[in-house]
Regions:
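A short helix-loop-beta-strand connector motif used in the catalytic cores of GNAT acetyltransferases and
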Residues: 43-56
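Conserved GNAT-fold acetyl-CoA-binding loop/helix
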Residues: 22-43
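Acyl-donor (CoA/ACP) binding surface of acyl/acetyltransferases
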Residues: 1-21, 54, 58-174
Length: 174
């Protein structure tokens, strides 16, 4: 896997995720999104100039789009903390794509920003994502009660984090 900026043909994937609940289920579906919203953002800034920032996750062999990663500065902006997220197409789940994408995003953020901490939240029931985060070097830091509303009920989340010191040889970007 590798990360790259989005190209115009990639925008179809966003439209599919915005209109087809089956692609995001069971944990990623948050409701229908306005059609064309991501296209407008891509035309403005390539999905890299506004929050959340987004990069495409593609295969190395044939540059096939398999999902995306996003990130946003959190916890007192300017203090070096980023929240990340990942969404992988169903046919690539369980094959290491999410783990690789999150690992690559951590490497990217630690090498290009002064971030000291990167974190992610996932539903307590999302065992696959918990394993992917752990394989990517994250540690479980805690449980937040009632943070996600899905299928008519509030659900708990686990918070996972990684700090720059966890990765040997990682120093802030100049």
């Amino acid at each position: 896997m590798r990360l790259r900026p989005f190209t115009e043909p990639d925008l179809e994937l966003f439209e599919r995720f915005a209109t087809d609940p089956a692609l995001s289920e069971p944990f990623g579906w948050v409701g229908f999104m306005p059609p064309g919203g991501y296209r407008k953002r891509w035309e403005q800034d390539g999905l890299l100039g506004s929050i959340p920032y987004c990069l495409a996750v593609v295969t190395i062999d044939d540059d096939a789009l398999v999902g995306w990663v996003d990130w946003r500065e959190t916890e007192r902006p300017g203090r070096g903390a980023w929240e990340i997220g990942v969404l992988i197409v169903p046919e690539m789940r369980g094959r290491g794509a999410g783990t690789a994408a999150q690992r690559l995003l951590v490497e990217y953020l630690f090498s290009t920003t002064t971030a000291f901490r990167i974190w992610a939240a996932t539903e307590a029931e999302n065992i696959a994502e918990q394993r992917a985060l752990e394989r990517s070097g994250f540690s479980q830091e805690g449980r937040l009660r009632g943070t996600h509303f899905r299928d008519g009920q509030w659900r708990d989340s686990f918070i996972y984090g990684i700090i720059r010191d966890d990765i040997s040889g990682s120093s802030p970007a100049a």
